[in-house]
Structures are given as C-alpha cells and as structure tokens.
Amino acid sequence: MATSLRGLDAGPGSLRRWILICFAALLLLPPRPNLGYNENYTEPVCGTPWWPDNLEESHHWPWEASLQIEDKHVCGGALIDRSWVVSAAHCIQGNKEYSVMLGSSTLHPNGSSWTLKIPVGDIIIHPKYWGRNFIRSDIALLCLETPVTFNKYVQPICLPEHNFNFKVGTKCWVTGWGQVKQHSSAQLTPAPELWEAEVFIIDNKNCDSIFHKKTLYPQVVPLIRKNMICTTNYGEDLCYGDPGGPLACEIDGRWILAGVFSWEKACATVPNLSVYTRITKYTIWIKDQVSHGAQLGPCRTSWLLLLPWLLQLPVSL
C-alpha cells in the first residue's frame, strides 16, 4: 500500500532537513576498502616502477588501466594519482556504468590478490573535445569511487610540465590490450595479455604530410595539430590498439605520460603512424580538475552537484 508524504506531516523545512541529513550520511560513509593491497606496500614517487630482474623478457607498467563496461574491456588508461585515471574522450559511450581494472597485465586475472576493480564515480570530458572526422582534444578524466592503495603493481605515472618539449626521435613505449600485426579486415577483439611496443616521436609536419597523402583534405587543412603527438615504429606497433592507452617516455630516470592514444593509420601500411593527445597541452587543465575534485572529497561529486537542485524541489507531492 502506498504511503502519502502528506500523512507524515512533512513541511518544506523538515523535508529539506531530511534531504540534508541523507546526503550527510552518504558522505560520511567510509570508502570501501581495497582488499588485497596491504602486501608489499610502497609509497611511490610517480614514474618510478618496480621492474622484473630480466628486462629482456618483460617490462612492468603499474599505471596501466583497463576501462571496462560490464567486465568487458573497452579502452586503456593511465593512473596519475590515487583517484584519477586519464583516458580518451571518445571512449566514453553515453550514460554507461564504467569500472577501472588496475594491477594486472591480463584482462582475466582469475582473482589475483593484487588486481583492483574500482567503479568510476565521475567522468570529465575536455570541453573542446571534437569527435567527428579527425578527433581533437581527445582526453577525459575518470575519478575513481575509491582511492587506490599503491604497491609495486599499482603506481602512478608522472604528468609532464606544460612547457616540456618531447623532442623528435625520443624513444617511448606504447602499451595496451589491442591487436598486434593484424590485417585491417580482422575482427577487433582485445588481446588477453598486455602488449608493449617501442615507438619513436616524429615531427608533426612530417606526420601531417603522410596522412594528407591518404585523404582528400587540402594541405592547408592541418590534420595533425599542436595538441597532438605522432609516433612510428616502422612496422611493429599496436595495430588497432587501445584508445586511451598511455604513451610513456623515460626522461631522466622518470616515466612521463607523453600522450593518450587517440587514432592511427591502418597498421597494414608502412610506416605505422599513431596519433596521441599531447598531454603537455592539457597538464594545467588536468591539475585544475584533480585539485577541484580533491576539494570535494571522494568522487561522489555528482551527488553534491545535485544537492542545490534537490533542495529547491516543490514539496507538494
């Protein structure tokens, strides 16, 4: 049997008080613990990962993130602090419920004690994102509902200063669960294990010229802009590899997030070219968003933003 609110003698003042009490209770709830992350605890400096003894066999990318919908991998990402992951804006598919997996190089970790699966509490897409034709400002920030506990399997990558210049020829690494050496007609399914490929930064003008040869756009229309960064490996790259995945470069002993994977030329062609969102063009924006989020507390920001609106609702139901 339905109960009328009128029968509860709830006036405008009391209803607003109840709303405030409910929101206060939600905000005071302790965050859900990240079980399994007390072993090998470290308080890392960004961009200084733990490496296996044999570097020839494999590297270790503790900032690598898998953005998932209903436990299915959709995009890559990079952990930049306890609560924030950087990914590509075009990965966000409307009003979906996302989670982020951290601490594993496989998409199916089988209950590994160091693997985290954390719901995404808030998503911020850059206001100048353009998703048609050649993508622009392809960057998004994912705020985790629960801050992570760092250990040797989960650590952040460094953000570059906004005025840092990644020189042409710089050797970097691209990682992700994308296909490797697959024909363009192959079915696009994620690889079960994390791939890595060594790539080199190339000049934007050279990259732009190569792309123009494959399009009908006139030369006066730039395809590769200043807020993008271009790489090649002349034959071995992450073909159809993870959108949103990190381009990581080791600079003076620290690993720096140079780019976020955005789009690429077909990997059946040579040279293999990949285009990334250039992080230096967005460092200030990222830091502003992270700082603002820290002031609001854990990523229940969507609830907080709704609070003023809820308090203005009419009470006659």
Curated annotation (Swiss-Prot):
Annotated PROSITE patterns: TRYPSIN_DOM, TRYPSIN_HIS
Domain annotation Peptidase S1: ranges: 44-291
GO CC entries: extracellular region
Sorted UniProt keywords: Disulfide bond, Glycoprotein, Secreted, Signal
GO biological process: one example: proteolysis
Source superkingdom: Eukaryota
Localization, UniProt: Secreted
Subcellular location, principal: secreted
Annotated disulfide bonds: 75-91, 172-249, 207-230, 239-267
Positions annotated as glycosylated: 40, 110, 272
InterPro entries documented for this protein: Peptidase_S1_PA, Peptidase_S1_PA_chymotrypsin, Peptidase_S1A, Ser/Thr_Proteases_Immune/Dev, Trypsin_dom, TRYPSIN_HIS
Residues making up the signal peptide according to the UniProt record: 1-35
Entries under Pfam families matching the protein: Trypsin
GO molecular function, one term: serine-type endopeptidase activity
Family listed: Belongs to the peptidase S1 family.
Name of the protein: Inactive serine protease 45
Organism, as annotated: Mus musculus
